[in-house]
Amino acid sequence: LFDKDPSLELFMQYSKNPFRKFNKRELFGIGARFNIKENLKAGVGLMNEKEEDLLAVTDNTLRITSYVHNEFIIEENIIFDLSVFLQPGIDSFSDYKATLIGQFDFHINDSFKISLQYNTFYDSRPPSNAVKKEEGFATVFSYNFN
């Protein structure tokens, strides 16, 4: 079923975003990654999330975290990446976060890449005054010095 044995993942995140109506978000997690096919990966794990809104109200949530990531090679220098994340709370599955990220990568040469990204984020119980769903577009220019 899998190309390789599952691998262990450890991850952490610290972010601040007053535009999304939260002061900070901290998370730490552990999980397993499965290589289903060469370009298809999935993961599942547990994470502890701590959020603080702009009024300094904090919320700690233990969540299941899961994702699927697929990479589609369109041309030799054009790749489409698709990632989907689902993170329900362990105490209440109706408290969940879901994220979808789609990205075209245009490799100009071995060092330079232009990426066009679309993302959407849904939080069933967002911090006070925040919206439940957000969407965004981004253009990213990357240069690899190696």
Predicted regions and their residues:
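Gram-negative (and chloroplast) outer-membrane scaffold detector with strong preference
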Residues: 2-49
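Outer-membrane beta-barrel "beta-signal"
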Residues: 104-107, 133-146
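Residue-level signature of outer-membrane beta-barrel architecture
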Residues: 1, 14, 34-36, 40, ...
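Transmembrane beta-strands of outer-membrane beta-barrel pores
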Residues: 12-18, 46-52, 86-90, 120-124, ...
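Residues that define the transmembrane beta-barrel architecture of outer-membrane proteins
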Residues: 24-28, 58-64, 94-98, 133-137
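Repeated loop/turn-to-beta-strand initiation elements of outer-membrane beta-barrel proteins
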Residues: 2-8, 38-42, 72-80, 106-116
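Histidine/lysine/aspartate-rich catalytic loop segments that bind and position anionic ligands
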Residues: 42-77
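Membrane-embedded beta-strand positions of outer-membrane beta-barrel proteins
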Residues: 10-12, 30, 42-44, 66, ...
